[in-house]
Amino acid sequence: MGGGIVGLSTAYYLQKEGHQVVVVDQGAMDGGASHVNAGYLTPSHIVPMAAPGMVAKGFRWMFNASSPFYMKPRWDKDLISWGLKFMKSCTPEHVQRSMQAILEINLFSKQLYLEMQQSGALDFHLETKGLLMAYQTTHAEKEEAEVVAWARGLGLTVKQLDLAAVSAMQPKAPMNIAGAYWYESDAHSTPEIFMKNLHTELQNQGVAFMLETEVTGFQKTNKQIAAVVTNKG
């Protein structure tokens, strides 16, 4: 497994269950998206990426390296097959089927972070102050109102705030907005601090790390993985 947030979190829970764990990473575990993302824990983000309108946006974004939907252009049958399936999934029916599952995963993820912090074994920044989704125009307000209705239907607490209420909540961050929706469920952390302290905690618990090591394959016995092959043996 790699040394990003997924790899280290997996190592954390495996060692808690009594397993001997070795984390293999091709770098030095000092960079990448796990260290520099926004750190949001967002139960409010219940709408799947495959949603109505994403096909048109996707075509505009997929060739832009700075977009959230960038893909390196290439002729790849698996990528083309995935793209066709993605297009077929961009329907209102798919959105409605997916939201409950996405919410449950997001809430469970937030719960695990809270449990990590409350255990006292891992010191990291975590605030549960919610998330403001601000808007400037009536059109943007109506678009977000649709998501708000879905979120409330799934049990999330969402409040609509005018500019004065937003300013009272964020007095040191003046905003050129008409208002905002506040999702009470959301939280945020500081990824760089979390990753650093999680790495230290894993070392203290006996997890081994093989850095600057690339996984090149696997050895199998009876169709099961018996060993990992790396560029160092």
Walk through the language-model features, giving the residues of each.
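Helical element adjacent to the flavin cofactor pocket in flavoenzyme catalytic cores
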Residues: 142-154, 173-232
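N-terminal Rossmann-fold NAD(P) dinucleotide-binding loop
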Residues: 7-8
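Dinucleotide-binding Rossmann-like beta1-alpha1 core, especially the glycine-rich loop
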Residues: 38-162
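Glycine-rich Rossmann-fold phosphate-binding loop(s) that bind the pyrophosphate
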Residues: 2-4, 26
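Residue-level detector of anion-binding/catalytic polar loops
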Residues: 20, 157, 208
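Gly/Ala-rich phosphate-binding loop of Rossmann-like dinucleotide-binding domains
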Residues: 11, 15-16, 201-203
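Glycine-rich FAD pyrophosphate-binding loop
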Residues: 15-36
